[in-house]
Amino acid sequence: MLAYPVSKKPINYKDKIFMQPKLDGVRCVIQCDNDVITAYSRTGKEWKNIEHIKMELRAFFDKYPKVILDGELYNHDLRDNFEKIISLVRKQKPTEEQRLEASNLTQFHCYDVISLAGVKVECKFEDRIEFVNESLMLLDYIHIVDTYSVGSALEAKILHQKNLALGYEGSILRTNDSYACKRSHNLRKFKDFSDKEATIVGYLDGKGKREGTLGKFIMQDDEGVEFGCPPGKGYNYKDLANMLSNIHDYIGQRATFTYFERTKAGSYRHPLFKTLRNYE
């Protein structure tokens, strides 16, 4: 289920509303097919370098083989290094060394279930998250995302600020409705920065102390707006130097960037390159 920005539609806090921290991880749906546990991205790409996670979920799927878990591959200690998680989980033929590194750094954080087939519970969110909390064991690699009930816009704002202070990228507001396998107003993003995709069409070298590294990408959005977009958090001097050395691997690629807001003229305030959009 994809989320709309919270600003798109007013929230009725007289209804049951729940809030979770928004993770800056990699979407992961895990299910069991014919006794084989598989994990997928939101576009259906299989994640193959998370055997440690699937092993820990074996007992759960032995008991609930028809349940589909929804969450993210994430590690809060790597919250400023999104690229590291991607580089680990996207391996299609991981070496033993890469499997070991993934087992040390990659966790599954569950925030919902897509299907509760065969389980006698209702489909409202409060019932789904209650099932998760009661049925999913907390192990080394399995985490349950904290979920709180909020009763007002002020309460939501206070909790959102707490999530930001804890290092999360924002918050998610959920209505107490059934799961929707599409972008839905049942799920709202509550964050200060927005994500968007654009195409890398050029670049500028770094200057001064950043000489010999990438200064910024030149990107073009789907409306034809061009803008400079320097790499954001998580990229060190060595990373920026490697980007410049391999710049032709980036030109023409779709990429995700973050920005604070758009001006009346349509330009982006504080755009930052996040990652290439080639991992799903």
PLM regions: where:
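Covalent nucleotidyltransferase
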Residues: 11-138, 279
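Short, motif-level signal for alpha-helix interfacial/capping segments enriched in acidic residues
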Residues: 2-9, 87-96, 150-157
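N-terminal, charged amphipathic alpha-helical interaction modules
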Residues: 142-144
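Amphipathic alpha-helical
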Residues: 146-194
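Short, structured patches in soluble enzyme cores that scaffold and shape functional sites
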Residues: 71-73, 110-117, 146-149, 175-177, ...
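Classical nucleotidyltransferase
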Residues: 18-20, 26-71, 180-280
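Short Pro/Gly-enriched beta-strand edge/turn motifs at strand-loop
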Residues: 2-3, 8-15, 198-203
